[in-house]
Amino acid sequence: MTLGGLKPEVHAANDEIRQVVAKVADELKSKLNTTEVEPVSYKTQLVAGTNYFIKVKTPAGFAHARVYKDLQQNHSVHSVKADGITEESEIVYF
């Protein structure tokens, strides 16, 4: 595996990503001011750990979340982007 750039492949949400979102659900809900988040699709970036760029569905629409998993397997929400995100929006680095 190479370190660095965001991988171009978009993957449908799977059990691994649902678990990642579940681990940070409260933080995501707070940052997005919502009561529900459901992962839809994602991309990854290998760094000193893994960045997950996840498209999530909320009652208000869609958002992108950047979740970091460090080498000790701790998860945290790095950032979220909701403005202008639609179901068709490409997942890009932010």
Swiss-Prot record:
Site note Reactive site applies to 5
Q: Name one GO cellular component term.
A: vesicle
- Indicate which residues form the motif Secondary area of contact: 45-49
Q: Which InterPro entries match?
A: Cystatin_dom (IPR000010), Cystatin_sf (IPR046350), Prot_inh_cystat_CS (IPR018073), Prot_inh_stefin (IPR001713)
Compartment(s) of residence? Cytoplasm
Annotated keywords: Cytoplasm, Protease inhibitor, Thiol protease inhibitor
Offer one example of a GO biological process linked to this entry. adenylate cyclase-activating G protein-coupled cAMP receptor signaling pathway
Main localization (coarse): cytoplasm
Which GO molecular function terms does the record list? cysteine-type endopeptidase inhibitor activity
Quote the SUPFAM superfamilies the UniProt record gives: Cystatin/monellin (SSF54403)
Role according to the record: Intracellular thiol proteinase inhibitor. Inhibits papain, but not cathepsin B.
Task: Give the family, as the similarity comment puts it.
Answer: Belongs to the cystatin family.
Q: What is this protein called?
A: Cystatin-A1
| Organism field | Dictyostelium discoideum (Social amoeba)
State the encoding gene: cpiA
